[in-house]
């Protein structure tokens, strides 16, 4: 199976493709991520609350927030910006030793960038609607590629509430 749900209240969770290559992520990484997400959501109220970090061998190397509204460009998703920054910092085309963590399941556009960047582990805190995220790629698509990341959904109330409040405010604004 390519997608796993992991309880966020556990003390630690492990993400691994092989027994000999385990990336251990503890609650500190998740806690720091959620604190930063909450801070950014209050600062950037016009943007969808999508926040992404990339870790290279367990070290934070890149973090970005959505800039779609700020730049008036639909390609400025946090995942794509974060991947660009990470590649620049590491001076590489592929992010093979990296883990991407993001507040919302990557959309199909971001999924393409993740696949082409060969990021082996993708963690997201809120699933996308059916058919709109990386986990909805077809079996044919997955097996036609020589690479596909492991996907982990770790649902959190903070991420869920950030998106709920964002869309509640948006609906009021346009009604």
What role is predicted for each listed range?
Residues 1-47, 106, 112-175:
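Zinc-dependent deaminase
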Residues 49-56:
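Short beta-strand scaffold segments in enzyme catalytic cores
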Residues 83-95:
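A contiguous binding-surface segment within folded domains or other stable secondary-structure elements
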Residues 92-104:
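Immediate flanking context of iron-sulfur cluster ligation sites
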Residues 61-68:
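Short beta->alpha transition motifs characteristic of CBS
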Residues 68-81:
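A short, polar/charged loop-to-alpha-helix boundary motif
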